[in-house]
């Protein structure tokens, strides 16, 4: 049961349930457009998975461990002596990570206040499509009413049915981000973005990391050229890859380690047993809708539990909208959720709102990084699209040579008839930054010649994007 702490005379125009990247951005944008807005977040800290236990803390650890690895592996070539003597204090590394996270979460709370968004710390559940009960973290219940509600509750890690998370030995991404000591042996089940990034963190600090993957290759949605380059680089940095078709058994031991028996793909599918003291399960994420009361209010979900939405983020129930990881549209990425939050708020304010799902980048923050947008070569072949390929390696790029970050390449795919850019795939130390130029080009329908004839600063790694585009419509100059 719920109780109203005060009479509701003036309902909110918009209540956003969830304060992650999609939710808090939607709330701020709605308020900026003149709508009376509230945001409800049960975590007690804004920013969602991304800021608290995802994108941001993982980047903090990736940065710290890259500096450590770089000191040991590369400093002497720059004439910086003594790098091999650098040590890592994991506790201090974790403290710095938390400092970054706390600063950003408090910053988001300030932004809500600045934009006059009412912030409720608690768990929201639908009583009716226009009434929400908020169970406050202070133990009090409060009913709030809204003309429109945006569901932005995000997602949570998926556990294997026979292997629940204990966050000590069997880890989700949350547990892997919080380790206080380096595992001697880590097995990562799932060779996607999360598994590869967090495997890299602990491999750089000396853990023996093995990534096992059900698909024929790690990061199976990437262009195959990109995957091959990435896997090769990770192996050189201490991560092994084992393809498998199944898991036959998992056995615990009394010394805090486990034995994992895998059915390995090659050599006739024989069983192989891997021992580890940390098992990271990164087999995907599932939408988080527990306690929302969607079923009793007849909000439609698909067979996997995602909220079904239409072209304007509307559910089948009037006044109820949904964005981000919880919906059945687009990749489960923070920046996708942010764009949906802006577009949904604009629509609720009576303005046009749109997300171009064909131009949403994906980045893996390993070293080298991988960034992709648009179609892969495999997708174009499958669709029967006539296309051209332009590639340029970073070992022919002046800036990359000067700073000894020569791994990788840029690959551009264009329509053979029109020269319009259909996909861009980058492997290099700064791929996540370089992809921005490709996004802008694709968003505005640019051709490879448009980019190839645009003057790029020298020496920069962005020149590799220009040269790859030149390879599509003419020839490269520097390779």
Curated annotation (Swiss-Prot):
Protein's UniProt keywords contain Metal-binding: no
GO biological process entries: 2-oxoglutarate metabolic process
Record-listed NAD(+) binding positions: 190-197, 213, 247, 284
Keywords: Disulfide bond, FAD, Flavoprotein, NAD, Oxidoreductase, Redox-active center
Binding locations of FAD: 41-50, 59, 124, 153-155, 325, 332-335
Note describing how the cofactor binds: Binds 1 FAD per subunit.
A matching Pfam family: Pyr_redox_2
Description of how the protein assembles with itself and partners: Homodimer.
Cysteines joined through disulfide linkages: 50-55
Cofactor names: FAD
Cellular component aspect of the GO annotation: cytoplasm; mitochondrion; oxoglutarate dehydrogenase complex
Enzyme Commission code: 1.8.1.4
Protein name: Dihydrolipoyl dehydrogenase
Active site, UniProt feature: 458
Keyword Transmembrane recorded: no
Annotated organism of origin: Trypanosoma brucei brucei
Note: The active site is a redox-active disulfide bond.
Record family assignment: Belongs to the class-I pyridine nucleotide-disulfide oxidoreductase family.
GO molecular function terms attached to this record: dihydrolipoyl dehydrogenase (NADH) activity; disulfide oxidoreductase activity; flavin adenine dinucleotide binding
Catalysed reaction, written as an equation: N(6)-[(R)-dihydrolipoyl]-L-lysyl-[protein] + NAD(+) = N(6)-[(R)-lipoyl]-L-lysyl-[protein] + NADH + H(+)
InterPro entries: Class-I_Pyr_Nuc-Dis_Oxidored, FAD/NAD-bd_sf, FAD/NAD-binding_dom, FAD/NAD-linked_Rdtase_dimer_sf, Lipoamide_DH, Pyr_nuc-diS_OxRdtase, Pyr_nucl-diS_OxRdtase_dimer, Pyr_OxRdtase_I_AS
């Amino acid at each position: 049961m719920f109780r109203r702490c005060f009479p509701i005379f003036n309902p909110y125009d918009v209540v956003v349930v969830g304060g992650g990247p999609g939710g808090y951005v939607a709330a701020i944008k709605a308020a900026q457009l003149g709508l009376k807005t509230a945001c409800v977040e049960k975590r007690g800290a804004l920013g969602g998975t991304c800021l608290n236990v995802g994108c941001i803390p993982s980047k903090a650890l990736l940065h710290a461990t890259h500096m450590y690895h770089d000191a040991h592996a590369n400093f002497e070539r720059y004439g910086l002596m003594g790098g091999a003597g650098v040590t890592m204090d994991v506790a201090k590394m974790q403290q710095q990570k938390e400092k970054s996270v706390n600063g950003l979460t408090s910053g988001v709370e300030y932004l809500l206040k600045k934009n006059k968004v009412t912030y409720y710390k608690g768990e929201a559940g639908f009583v009716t499509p226009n009434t929400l009960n908020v169970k406050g973290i202070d133990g009090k219940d409060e009913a709030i009413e809204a003309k429109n509600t945006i569901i932005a509750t995000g997602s949570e890690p998926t556990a294997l049915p026979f292997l629940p998370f204990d966050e000590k030995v069997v880890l989700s991404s949350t547990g892997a981000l919080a380790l206080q000591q380096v595992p001697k042996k880590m097995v990562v089940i799932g060779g996607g973005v999360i598994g590869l990034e967090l495997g890299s963190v602990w491999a750089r600090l000396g853990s023996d990391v093995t990534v096992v993957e059900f698909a024929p290759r790690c990061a199976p949605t990437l262009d195959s050229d990109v995957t091959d380059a990435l896997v090769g680089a990770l192996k050189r940095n201490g991560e092994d890859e084992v393809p498998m078709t199944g898991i036959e058994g998992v056995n615990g031991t009394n010394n805090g380690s486990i034995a994992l028996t895998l059915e390995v793909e090659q050599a006739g599918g024989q069983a192989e047993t891997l021992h580890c003291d940390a098992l990271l399960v990164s087999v995907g994420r599932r939408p988080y809708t527990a306690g929302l009361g969607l079923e009793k209010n007849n909000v439609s979900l698909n067979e996997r539990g995602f909220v079904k939405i239409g072209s304007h983020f509307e559910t089948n129930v009037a006044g109820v909208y949904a964005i981000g990881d919880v919906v059945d549209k687009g990749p489960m990425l923070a920046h996708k959720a942010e764009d949906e939050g802006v577009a949904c708020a604009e629509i609720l304010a009576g303005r046009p709102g749109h997300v171009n799902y064909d131009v949403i980048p994906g980045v893996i923050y390993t070293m080298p990084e991988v960034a992709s947008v648009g179609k892969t070569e495999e997708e174009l072949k499958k669709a029967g699209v006539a296309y051209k390929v332009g590639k340029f390696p970073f070992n022919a790029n002046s800036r990359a040579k000067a700073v000894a970050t020569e791994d990788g390449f840029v690959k551009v795919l264009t329509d053979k008839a029109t020269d319009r850019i259909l996909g861009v795939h980058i492997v290099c130390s700064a791929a996540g930054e370089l992809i921005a130029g490709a996004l802008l080009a694709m968003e505005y329908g640019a051709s490879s010649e448009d980019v190839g004839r645009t003057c790029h600063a020298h020496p920069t790694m962005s020149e590799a994007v220009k040269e790859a585009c030149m390879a599509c419509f003419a020839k490269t100059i520097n390779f």
